[in-house]
Curated annotation (Swiss-Prot):
This is Protein C4. One of its GO terms (biological process) is symbiont-mediated suppression of host innate immune response. It comes from Tomato yellow leaf curl Sardinia virus (isolate Spain-1). The lineage of its organism: Viruses, Monodnaviria, Shotokuvirae, Cressdnaviricota, Repensiviricetes. Coiled coil: none annotated. It is found in: Host cell membrane.
Length: 96
């Protein structure tokens, strides 16, 4: 397994006690495989498992992507949001 690379973002609203923390962990693999696991915390109550796992593989200049949603079919979202955009979207949906 390669070096650990991680990122974290935090969001809260003035008129709410809800606080959301999103973090992603990257484990670069041999031959440029990249595995990404995303975790979400609401009000600092950690989830027991990753919410999704995305794998990217570069072979001969071709990118292959695979995303496993570990929360079920109803919660599938495209994995094209930045951490900040993801936090804003989750905040919007939770605080509606």
């Amino acid at each position: 397994m390669g070096n650990l690379i991680s990122t974290c973002s935090f969001s809260s609203r003035v008129n709410s006690t809800a606080k959301i923390t999103d973090s992603s962990i990257w484990y670069p693999q041999p031959d440029q495989h990249i595995s990404i696991r995303t975790f979400r915390e609401l009000n600092q109550a950690p989830t027991s498992s990753p919410t999704s796992t995305r794998t990217e593989m570069f072979l001969n200049g071709v990118l292959s992507r695979s995303t496993d949603d570990l929360q079920g079919e109803d919660s599938r979202q495209p994995m094209t949001l930045t951490p900040r955009q993801l936090t804003q979207e989750v905040s919007r949906r939770l605080l509606m």
